[in-house]
């Protein structure tokens, strides 16, 4: 779990996301509070529940990007889901409890990778011995000490060659565990546990088998290391650690929550399952026990972060019980032309850097002047104002339109240096930006 301070978290988010300081502060404090809670004694720790967050803001201002970056910083089980993917119990579609099941699967994968990394050195040694056994079968009992001594010396010579990579391309035949059979079983809602048990049964049936395979030594080493590491780690410990990680540090990000709201002034009809999904979410957010194939998981201390544009609805259109479970409200601001300039230049691997690097692979040197970047930002803002405001996503459309001709003819323009300045931007984008109909359909 991450022990970064709120200031460090915000600084890290700043290198990828422009503006939205309130949202960054809120998620930074929430993430730090996860660490603070784990420092308390057990009795008090159980009483401290997470303060769930609702992020409100127009599309394309950074809500989802904050979630993506937070997932990398958290070092904890993290899942991002779309609220629109779920339906209430009894309707065809995914039930909300699958969120926790998917989170548990993710935690198992995280803990397994961590444990296998911990025993990596032992696994490498065991894999090395198995390779040497294939190259130099052990001497049989009954041979004299001299033969065994010679065998040991030869083994050391081959070990040295193996570590130096001199045997990498040599092909050997060895026994490897058969790959697990992937069995996908479709089941009616509410019977996911039964399907997971059947899947485990089929996988266990195939896990004991071994196959003879011919591989190059460098590929065989990798396969054997994974096999040996899987033997060393304790699967029951992995399962328990993963469940603890989900219960104590798990984070669920629910995007597009506004799409399951029903407007207060709307009449009946429409999607009958919208309010049902909200009611199904309530027990998870408040705290309940969910059955998964790895064991029972309590959701009392899982942090939930919800986000939505709320263009057609308002946060107050959420059912009151769910509103009460999302006590921290953060409003993200619409982006201005100045924000667009910063987005094009400041973040790590900004859009301009990406296009410069992509075209450089074909020998085309591209530079963006300050007035060129300002012209791109102004054009994007203008189209957002006159048509639909899709935030920073408009920049992707503008940039693609701008370098379309360059990208198509890059192989014929190798060695050229192209400067994208205000005149270049105006020449390509001005007609489309001015014509509202063209903007609506092209940009």
Swiss-Prot record:
User: What Gene Ontology terms for biological process does this UniProt record contain?
Assistant: protein unfolding; proteolysis involved in protein catabolic process
The UniProt record lists the keyword DNA-binding: no
SUPFAM superfamilies listed in its UniProt record: P-loop containing nucleoside triphosphate hydrolases (SSF52540)
Q: Which UniProt keywords apply?
A: ATP-binding, Chaperone, Cytoplasm, Nucleotide-binding, Stress response
Please give one Pfam family short name.
AAA_2
Which GO molecular function annotation, any one, does this entry have?
proteasome-activating activity
Q: Where in the cell is it found?
A: Cytoplasm
Binding residues annotated for ATP, in chain numbering = 18, 60-65, 255, 321, 393
What residue ranges carry the coiled-coil annotation? none
Which domain of life does the UniProt lineage start with?
Bacteria
Could you state one GO cellular component term attached to this entry?
HslUV protease complex
UniProt lists the family membership as follows: Belongs to the ClpX chaperone family. HslU subfamily.
Q: How does it assemble?
A: A double ring-shaped homohexamer of HslV is capped on each side by a ring-shaped HslU homohexamer. The assembly of the HslU/HslV complex is dependent on binding of ATP.
Report the protein's function.
ATPase subunit of a proteasome-like degradation complex; this subunit has chaperone activity. The binding of ATP and its subsequent hydrolysis by HslU are essential for unfolding of protein substrates subsequently hydrolyzed by HslV. HslU recognizes the N-terminal part of its protein substrates and unfolds these before they are guided to HslV for hydrolysis.
Name of this chain's protein: ATP-dependent protease ATPase subunit HslU
| Annotated organism of origin | Colwellia psychrerythraea (strain 34H / ATCC BAA-681)
Q: Which gene encodes it?
A: hslU
